[in-house]
Amino acid sequence: RFYIWVIRGTPLLVQLFIIFYGLPSVGIMLDAFPAAVIAFAFNEGAYCAETMRGALESVPQGQLEAGYCVGMSWWQIMRRIVLPQALRTAVPALSNSLIGMIKDTSLASNITVAELFMAGQRVAARTYIFLPIYCEVAVVYLLFCTVITKLQGLLERQLNAHGFQ
């Protein structure tokens, strides 16, 4: 709970800076890209953990009790009863987290990770053509997010087709 409280209570940009600029003060040197990956993993891990906790808690206790009554082990109950229902509940929120993370990758440019937004900034600074370039960057982000949204819809339909209500 402490990890989730700290990560959810601090901005991702601060987390990036602590990992990239702060860890060298205690002898841990990381290049920019691995530092960004670690920061994003810790950040998304906290949000996804809370999403999954909520999804698991949404499955009625009676479902577990019914599984025990028919002789299932805890692992069988989780795999065959609880997780399919929890996943159906969690997919929209997990997809939203993924979309948020895709958009947040622009923050990695603050620690010199060359990503989409930084590439747009470099081109705009070189050509002095700002609005069209930033609009193109926005369209690329929009396309990424649209693909994730479509995949989420397919996954939700697949889960619904299997009767996980």
Question: What is the role of each PLM region?
Answer:
Residues 1-165:
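Transmembrane alpha-helices and adjacent helix-loop boundaries
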